[in-house]
């Protein structure tokens, strides 16, 4: 990608700013004695007096909640009524994804909703916005709130963990719907989404206060843009939570097809029963305010994806299934469904800013994206080819449903698929819950009743939606067409052009317009096709 000199100056200015801030931080470490706490207090007050609109506008919790969703903080488990989160974020795959420009005072998303009444009111918290008096703890909170030492390998693992999710289960189904030539769409989306991921970096480097995807929307289109971007991102997370419920119901019912329950005249077959049981099982995890432990477990998402892929290849190449189907070259009638499925595979742009700003060497971000997209695309393509070759036109929306039940590799793949969403469900739904909790009036905001009510309502609603539309592949296609296209192909170029404006070269303008056009066309066609298929299935 060719950039003008003015574009590159954005990187230079940002890096210089980072070095200057690091130098100032080093000075504070050298001279930071208890006698200097008053100076730290004055500096903090000066910073707060000039608070950026990006840090005070809704959703203030986005940064930290997505950090938890996309990375692995230190384990410190607590329920809504009594939880606190250590700011020292150790990680299985990365350090805490925290913006290097992040202000000292961050919105509290892991703070207990119900304060300890016995705690002294003047006690300074690492999350407090206005400390009552200077103290040495202020210096501690400053040091503990910023971390950007993620290595190249750690950043790549985070990128793969974000990109390679349940979408990999449906790539064989996508080939079935679109034919072999439809795989071209997968590779095309990979290239376009990689490029738009780079555009987000330019937007982040345009101003030190621009830290998250909603901040980018704010910088590009004002508060309206911020709200629009946030709502789209939260809708996608909510829809992913619905997919987890459907996924659990489908896979558990395939292992226990005779399970059923009749209560008061209501009969629940196996998929609905397991969807209900899954919701009841994950509900307590949704009530957790600090999801660090779940983050550690869900960090195995990369391992789980690799394990499931290996099981598929083992069943196909070593066990008795083998390659039986030549498949269809092109299926134009249902190709739009595969467009949404392939689009869903690259839904990670909401977390890319966090990964970028956590890196010790941000200049390596392009290589991180390239490695992450390359690894995931190879995995997607490999699973798509192997799965469709094995099962042909009988390929289900999740290839795990096609695996022979009597094989050990099949059982490993199924149970891995079943266990993984139990940890990811709460991490996926919590950002949505936290954003809604921000809307609670301050005099009610500390009551855990409202938080539990919001989170329970969200969880129950995902169950109801999953029961009403229990079509995993079609729902995924709808998400990929309607929401993911907006997040990955339409909004990044639009924000890039709006923020950088005169600094953008004519070539970049042309490329951005082309990408937005492709995204818009795919979104309209894919959304219409997915909705039509869903309505058709509901009426049969």
From Swiss-Prot:
**Which species is listed as the source?**
Arabidopsis thaliana (Mouse-ear cress)
Please list where the region (Disordered) is annotated.
1-55
* Keyword field contains Membrane: yes
According to its UniProt record, which protein family does this protein belong to?
A: Belongs to the amino acid/polyamine transporter 2 family. Amino acid/auxin permease (AAAP) (TC 2.A.18.5) subfamily.
- What Gene Ontology cellular-component terms does the record carry? membrane; organelle membrane
Where in or outside the cell it occurs: the entry states:
Membrane
The keyword Transport appears for this protein:
yes
Q: Where is the composition biased (Polar residues)?
A: 1-11
GO function term, MF aspect, one: amino acid transmembrane transporter activity
Keywords on this record? Answer: Amino-acid transport, Membrane, Transmembrane, Transmembrane helix, Transport
Write down the Pfam families for this protein, in alphabetical order: Aa_trans
Q: Which GO terms describe its biological process?
A: amino acid transmembrane transport
Q: Where are the transmembrane segments?
A: 155-175, 180-200, 227-247, 273-293, 297-317, 332-352, 367-387, 412-432, 452-474, 478-500, 511-531
Q: How does it sit in the membrane?
A: Multi-pass membrane protein
Q: What is this protein called?
A: Amino acid transporter AVT1B
UniProt xrefs under PANTHER family: AMINO ACID TRANSPORTER, TRANSMEMBRANE AMINO ACID TRANSPORTER FAMILY PROTEIN
